[in-house]
Amino acid sequence: MMTVRLIAHTPEPEKVVAAAAKLCYSDAHITDLLDGLDEEKTAKFLTMLSDLGHASPIEHASFTFGIEGVSRTLLAQITRHRIASFSVQSQRYVRLDDFRYVVPPEIEAIPEAKAAFLASMEEDAKRYLDLAHKLEEGHTARLMAEGMPEKQARAKASKQANEDARFVLPNACETKMVVTMNARSLQNFFHLRCCSRAQWEIRELAEKMFGLVYPVAPHIFARSGPACVSGPCPEGKMCCGKTAEVRAKYASIKEAAGV
């Protein structure tokens, strides 16, 4: 089950962004940047930035998420968003004795497909652990033959075994990560990944992340979501044709945030 938490963010992110904008458009000194930046003036600066398309000040606000229960398939997609920082659970240093995996909804919905998928995952788990054990025993024997004490040899062999045994793990295998993005990168991420044409798992993640950051910085993310929330759909012939429904959905999310 996917779990997402907002574990840290820039303190007063909207005020920080407004201060950066104030510096750009006035002769204010660094020591005076925060003076007079009440909620109303902060909101005006942020609206101005959005109207002008001046996005660089928004980069001063960052958000850090803890994410688990997602697949390695998702990992391959989210790391394409390059202006971000990722720390991912290592399959090299962590032995996956408790093999967890993500079942796609379309597979879950078809009993025959689900049965075949679960059988495949069970077989993959067995092969992974069997291969890891064989590699560990082989590496231990080699290291001991080279003169290394058994306890030290087994510790080193275990890590070496994980390094190669992981090659049999499927894309469905669960992973955990900590991800940090600045607000501008998040806007782009939501623009692309909240779209109904995005792959289902990363779309679910993007929607959860949006739901977490919007209450913290509602003016920064006022026009965030899929592209059609704030303008015409850019997908052309690939458009889902549900722009009105999507806009209503995101209006509801924002209303529920109570800000």
Question: In which residue ranges do the predicted regions lie?
Answer:
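Family-specific signature for flavin-dependent thymidylate synthase
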Residues: 1-259
